[in-house]
């Protein structure tokens, strides 16, 4: 694997997505930089949680 593991803090929970609402879309801020991206998270998540991202370049599409 070429990419490094990155840690990101959940800044805002945007909403639920997926066919049955099993995925939560969140806005995260990387701890090592000032970058913000949107990610889809499976499982319980709330603001302030720290996520370990194996793939840090992939960004989720916006909710409709």
Swiss-Prot record:
It is found in: Cytoplasm. It holds the Pfam family Ribosomal_S28e. GO terms for biological process: translation. It comes from the Eukaryota. SUPFAM superfamilies: Nucleic acid-binding proteins. The keyword Transcription regulation does not apply. GO terms for cellular component: cytosolic ribosome; cytosolic small ribosomal subunit; plastid. Its main location: cytoplasm. Keywords: Cytoplasm, Ribonucleoprotein, Ribosomal protein. GO terms for molecular function: mRNA binding; structural constituent of ribosome. InterPro entries: NA-bd_OB-fold (IPR012340), Ribosomal_eS28 (IPR000289), Ribosomal_eS28_CS (IPR028626). Belongs to the eukaryotic ribosomal protein eS28 family. This is Small ribosomal subunit protein eS28x. It comes from Arabidopsis thaliana (Mouse-ear cress). The gene is RPS28C.
